[in-house]
Amino acid sequence: FLNNYKDKRIKMASDQTLDIIARNGGITRDELNDILIPNFEFGQDRTRTFDYGERKIKAKIDIMSTPANIIAYDEEGKILKGLPKASKKFNDVESAVEEYRREVKYIKKQIKEIITEQSSNLLRALFLERKWKTKRWIEIFIKNPVMQEFAVQLIWKETDENGKLIKTFRCMDNG
């Protein structure tokens, strides 16, 4: 998220602040970065419901598309071209709908940036042979709908306390 600022002083100050937070929390900067990945109010099943007033629009993060996308569904489950505009026919709350549409546009942009950044972070983790405790791994890669992209696309290995390989595995798209 630091890439959102053009002013290098803001980037540096943000970076230094995050380093301090990690140090004070007794964790590495990479561990803090894992924790800070937002879920954008989407559930573990990658869905979120937008309340338009009398109707509800369901949205789902499609992590398997390139780039990752958000697919909208009407109440019957029909795929929509995007989050629909407010409609008087359905008595939609126009202000809420417009806010949702802006939010989804922002989320799509953020997900793209997160995936790019996390791809680099995970490549570094691979070279450094970084390890996650099972509980933390589940929190980061299974429960966070944005990070599920990596859970399903990578082959993971489980090791014992001594680093001995127990098994390799791959997560399925349904978590």
Describe each PLM feature range.
Residues 1-175:
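Non-catalytic terminal/accessory regions
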